[in-house]
Amino acid sequence: MAKEEKEEIRYISITEARARKLDKFKMEGKIPSTNWAVKMGAAIGILTGRTGTARYKTGGRGHGVDIEAVDPQGLFRILVGKDIAQYARGGLDILIDELEKGKSVFDVYRKYSEGRTE
């Protein structure tokens, strides 16, 4: 009898380039924390259906956040399962792009929670 293993996601890996940009936004006071930004990225990724790709160059030190800090109740994982990290990276790319355009996190939240994508 084959024993079925339940694979748990414990860590959402983000690239060094994303981590540097998030640190810059945190220092400027645009975001409260990296964990918050990844949580917002996961929500945006799920709402838009966008998954992360190797958009930024990978390599160097690993950067990321603990999954429990992003999704303590497991709601995102219930919605998308093991793909939570890919949705988080996709949404994080959207969030970073919007912040680089000078938008506030409130504008970004309002735009994507209302379902607008333009």
Per-range role (PLM):
Residues 2-9, 15-36, 40, 58-65, ...:
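Surface-exposed, Lys/Arg-rich phosphate-binding patches that contact polyanionic backbones
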Residues 32-56, 99-104:
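Short, basic amphipathic alpha-helical segments that act as recognition/interaction helices
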Residues 47-83:
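Short, positively charged interaction helices/loops
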